[in-house]
Design a protein with these regions (language model features):
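Phosphate/pyrophosphate-binding betaalpha-module
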Residues: 58, 62-123
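Metallocofactor- and cofactor-centric catalytic cores in central/energy metabolism, strongly enriched
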Residues: 1-52, 66, 76-79, 87, ...
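Conserved mixed alpha/beta catalytic, RNA-binding, or beta-rich assembly cores of soluble enzyme
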Residues: 34-40, 90-94, 111-112, 140, ...
Length: 281
């Protein structure tokens, strides 16, 4: 973002994510060319209007956002927009859940309903059958979430495996086939690095060689430097609680996050700090 003729575009919640040296927000404060956008069409229009600038999109997410980025590449290709590139960190859940199943310290899984809308329930059903772990796809309203949690706790307490789709009003067995077909037209699977887990085979999504013009070097990404004492990796794996981290509520806060778990309002550390504070420290 400090390179002349380049501008980094990201969704607003990405700006505060700690980077190897600084966050995008901090880079912008120091004079880097960084901006946020609300939808991908904004980025496409900016690239069309400012042809002398290379726009690098921070394309981050899981199965839910991968179709969006596939559409961006499709539109850029059809509209002959050559000054727009994606720096991707797109990952898929089933492979990683499989990795977690082998870790041995997790008894059951509340599966992501929004991801299952795209992938379909069958991916999680297969995982449950393979590893003998109870898995429940839950919805996002209070009643659906509580129902899914209750079902999962009951299964764990009984020592049972099994799979349940408690979000059947939205999640089908096959998922959104057309959306995933679009992803497959522009992207391919590959190994990906996960914080706390290391490299997980075939859990990443990368642009195909045919569309390398739109790739800003995604396959060469390495894991960010993790500050000494940061417990984000273990928190994500369920091995530590946020309050086990020496940075929690002190040097790591929502306004100045040290680790990824404090960045989003949905992050474990941010939720615990908001709901429970730091009175026990």
């Amino acid at each position: 973002s400090f390179r002349g003729g380049h501008r980094v575009l990201a969704f607003g919640d990405m700006l505060a994510v700690p980077g190897t040296e600084m966050s995008l927000a901090e880079a912008r404060d120091r004079g880097a060319s960084v901006d946020f956008f609300y939808n991908p069409e904004d980025a496409l229009k900016k690239a069309e209007e400012e042809k002398e600038t290379i726009f690098v999109l921070a394309a981050v997410g899981f199965e839910t956002t991968a179709p969006v980025w596939a559409t961006v590449v499709k539109e850029a290709d059809e509209r002959h927009i050559s000054n727009l590139k994606l720096l991707t960190a797109l990952k898929t859940m089933p492979e990683t859940l499989g990795e977690l199943c082998t870790a041995g310290n997790i008894d059951g899984f509340l599966c992501p309903g929004h991801v299952a809308v795209i992938t379909g329930a069958e991916r999680y059903r297969a995982l449950s059958e393979t590893y003998g772990k109870p898995m429940v796809i839950g919805g996002f309203t209070a009643d659906l979430l509580l129902s899914a949690v209750a079902r999962l706790v009951l299964a764990v307490n009984k020592g049972q495996g099994g799979f349940w789709n408690d979000y059947g009003s939205v999640v089908t067995e096959k998922g959104n086939v057309k959306a995933w077909e679009r992803v497959g037209a522009f992207f391919e699977k590959g190994d990906a690095l996960w914080r706390g887990l290391g490299v997980v085979k075939n859990s990443g999504v990368y642009l195909k060689e045919k569309y390398h013009l739109y790739d800003a070097g995604s396959r060469g990404l390495v894991e960010d430097h993790i500050p000494a004492g940061c417990r984000c990796g273990n928190i994500l794996l369920g091995k530590n609680m946020p309050k086990d981290c020496p940075h929690f509520g002190r040097t790591c806060t929502p306004s100045h996050p040290v680790g990824a778990c404090m960045v989003s309002s949905e992050g474990a550390c941010c939720i615990i700090l908001r709901e429970e504070g730091v009175e026990e420290l």
